[in-house]
């Protein structure tokens, strides 16, 4: 066994951790399990390396260390400090291919994270002088990383242990808790439809709305909250929620906050507008237009993002807005007619012509180039088939209600 000075010299490796990952792994194997304090420190170093490197995550997984740590956790006997560093280490694993290809390991991790949440009071009583907040938070991150796994065991455990209620009733407003919590909810809502219907509740909507609008000014929290909410809307059965919670007004209020053009939040607003239109029947589209003035919001967003179609963020947002535009004007029935009439009156024709002109700018990135080509095609379809058409007009009586 090496002496303390030699062990301390290993800490110099921390200053270039990625290059020394193999050395970390060797050190851990050499000292484990006899010197827990030192190996906990090395495990903490490894966790920080893999947190920023997916390549390193795969390397550590292949070394067997993830499986070793997961199997070594004993929640009923391990000291809190040991549980803390082990859960932090495991929660940094985010490479989806590992979960997809190793179902047993995925289920093992899920059980650990579920057990920690269920045993939180017991863990707190074991050592009243130690804060278990980070253990709980890292367990949420771990669950967030595996929450996309579409297996019945995972879904049934969420329902059985009522993890959603635990998340919703958490008093924390910190990004540390909200980010993984909203990611879990979003992943679950994008899962099986029968599961979605089991967890949708007024409490869930209020939780999402509060975190999108009020509790936290962090743009990333608002963005991931909007993304999570968007996953609720998959078909006409969910259109009632749009109006029950006045969600279009929330989108408009958020857009009026004028977030920086490169932020994610306007992308999520544009995406959610498209979802509302996609799942709405004719009657609902009329409400979106007449009560919530959704056409004006679409125009304002297109005006903001149609000036620079060489910027990747602008291209994404413009593509989403154009998708929602073609979605609403192509609706059959009164809703589509109303949208065409409004866009013909509010200058949308000139705006879309400007968008098409912007599409002629050269783009280096092939993926973005394809997106711009799709924007141009959508613009031409809207102009040729809808806004320039004389066949889709509405009566003067209807016109007075717009």
Q: For each predicted feature, which ranges?
A:
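Helix-start/N-cap signature of alpha-helical segments
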Residues: 31-42, 58, 77-86, 102, ...
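Alpha-helical solenoid scaffolds in eukaryotic proteins
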Residues: 16-27, 45, 63-72, 107-119, ...
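Elongated alpha-helical scaffolds that mediate protein-protein interactions in large eukaryotic proteins
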Residues: 1-22, 39, 51-67, 95-110, ...
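Generic recognition of well-structured, leucine-rich alpha-helical segments
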Residues: 4, 28-31, 49, 53, ...
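Helix-loop junctions that connect tandem helical modules in alpha-solenoid scaffolds
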Residues: 23-35, 69-81, 115-131, 166-175, ...
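Alpha-solenoid helical-repeat scaffold
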Residues: 241-243, 248, 253-254, 260-402
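Alpha-helical solenoid repeat architecture
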Residues: 1-7, 40-54, 84-99, 137-150, ...
């Amino acid at each position: 066994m090496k002496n303390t000075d030699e062990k301390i010299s290993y800490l110099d490796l921390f200053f270039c951790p990625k290059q020394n990952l193999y050395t970390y792994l060797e050190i851990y194997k050499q000292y484990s399990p006899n010197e827990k304090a030192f190996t906990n420190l090395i495990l903490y170093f490894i966790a920080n390396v893999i947190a920023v490197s997916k390549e390193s995550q795969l390397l550590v997984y292949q070394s067997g260390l993830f499986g070793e740590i997961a199997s070594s956790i004993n929640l009923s006997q391990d000291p809190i400090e040991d549980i803390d560093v082990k859960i932090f280490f495991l929660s940094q694993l985010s490479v989806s291919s590992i979960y997809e290809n190793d179902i047993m390991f995925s289920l093992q991790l899920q059980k650990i994270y579920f057990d920690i949440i269920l045993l939180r009071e017991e863990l707190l009583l074991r050592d009243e002088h130690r804060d278990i907040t980070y253990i709980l938070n890292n367990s949420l991150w771990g669950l967030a990383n595996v929450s996309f796994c579409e297996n019945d065991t995972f879904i049934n455990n969420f329902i059985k242990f009522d993890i959603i209620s635990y998340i919703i009733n958490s008093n924390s407003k910190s990004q540390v808790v909200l980010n993984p919590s909203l990611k879990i909810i979003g992943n679950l809502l994008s899962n099986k439809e029968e599961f979605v219907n089991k967890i949708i509740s007024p409490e869930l909507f209020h939780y999402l709305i509060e975190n999108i609008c009020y509790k936290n000014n962090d743009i990333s929290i608002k963005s991931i909250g909007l993304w999570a909410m968007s996953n609720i809307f998959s078909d006409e059965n969910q259109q009632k929620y749009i109006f029950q919670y006045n969600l279009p007004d929330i989108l408009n209020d958020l857009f009026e906050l004028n977030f920086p053009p490169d932020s994610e939040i306007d992308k999520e607003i544009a995406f959610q507008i498209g979802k509302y239109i996609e799942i709405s029947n004719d009657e609902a589209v009329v409400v979106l237009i007449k009560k919530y003035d959704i056409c004006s919001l679409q125009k304002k967003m297109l005006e903001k993002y149609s000036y620079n179609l060489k910027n990747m963020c602008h291209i994404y947002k413009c593509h989403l807005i154009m998708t929602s535009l073609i979605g609403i004007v192509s609706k059959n029935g009164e809703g589509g007619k109303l949208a065409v009439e409004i866009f013909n009156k509010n200058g949308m024709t000139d705006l879309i012509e400007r968008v098409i002109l912007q599409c002629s700018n050269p783009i280096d990135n092939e993926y973005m180039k394809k997106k711009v080509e799709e924007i141009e095609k959508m613009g031409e379809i809207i102009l040729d088939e809808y806004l320039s058409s004389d066949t889709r007009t509405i009566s003067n009586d209807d016109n007075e209600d717009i």
